[in-house]
Structure formats: C-alpha cells, structure tokens
C-alpha cells in the first residue's frame, strides 16, 4: 500500500512531453558506468533516485532509468521533459551515437512536437559535452 501511495505522489499521469533533454554523466570518457550507478549517486545526493529516463552506456546499451510517466529530475524548471544521459563527458563512441539517434527519432514519433535540446541550453552547464543543435541538423 505504501508503494502504491508513493507511486501516486510521483506519478504524473500521461505527461505531455514537450522537450527531450540530452545530458552527459560527466564521468571519465570510456569508463563504464550504468543506470544503476547513476541511481546510487543520485540517492547519495539525497535525491529520489535516478532523475533520467534513459541512459546510454559506452557498451552500446540503452538502459531504462525512471519510467517516462514519472516526472524527470534532471533539469531544473524542465522536468516535464524526457531526460537522456550519455555516459562520458565529451567523447562518445559510435554505438552511443547510434542509440541516441534511434531513441531521439523514436521519441519524436511518439511526441510529434518534441523539442530536442542539450542541458546546456537550459542551464549554465557544459553538459552534454557537444552541440545538440548541430548534431540534430547534421547527424540526425
């Protein structure tokens, strides 16, 4: 019963996603981390677990974070957005790029008016370590 109640507090129904925000984990390039690691780091910061909806690892794995029907917790003021985290800082491998491309295309079909941006476009951060708008125009 407690789990159901806490899920109701966090659950936001069918969120109308308007943005997709791309992040990086700001971990050393090439080091393997995953969604479970990020979940643990976020808990250690006193947060409610992983704030991203999707994590893309250097091994080419797409891992689920929090469900998309839960509000994200990854960009202040923009948490009705899908959050994707690329593991690394500014050097991502071909597998990561391919997964990101496919995931963005899939989400743009699911949410036709979705605006795709980098974390640095809504915050004074260097995250995600690349120019998302250039990538969208030239690589998507």
Where are these regions (language model features)?
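Basic/polar, cationic surfaces and motifs that engage anionic cell-wall
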Residues: 5-25, 29, 58-62, 67-68, ...
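Short Gly/aromatic-enriched secondary-structure transition segments
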Residues: 35-42
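N-terminal cationic-hydrophobic initiation segments that often serve targeting/anchoring roles
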Residues: 43-46, 108
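Short, small/polar residue-rich loop motifs at catalytic or cofactor-binding pockets
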Residues: 49-50
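Gly/Thr-rich phosphate-binding loop signature of adenosyl cofactor/nucleotide-binding cores
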Residues: 54
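Flexible, surface-exposed loop/gating regions in the mature catalytic domains
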Residues: 71-73
């Amino acid at each position: 019963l407690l789990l159901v109640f806490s899920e109701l507090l966090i659950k936001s129904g069918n969120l109308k996603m308007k943005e997709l925000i791309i992040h990086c984990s700001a971990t050393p390039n090439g080091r393997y981390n995953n969604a479970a690691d990020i979940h643990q780091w976020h808990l250690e910061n006193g947060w409610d677990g992983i704030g991203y909806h999707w994590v893309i690892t250097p091994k080419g794995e797409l891992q689920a974070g929090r469900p998309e029907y839960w509000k994200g917790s990854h960009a202040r003021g923009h948490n009705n957005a899908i959050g994707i985290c690329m593991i690394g800082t500014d050097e991502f491998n071909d597998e990561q790029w391919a997964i990101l491309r496919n995931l963005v295309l899939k989400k743009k079909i699911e949410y036709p008016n979705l605006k795709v941006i980098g974390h640095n476009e809504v915050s004074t951060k260097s995250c995600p370590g690349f120019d998302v708008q250039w990538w969208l125009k030239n690589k998507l």
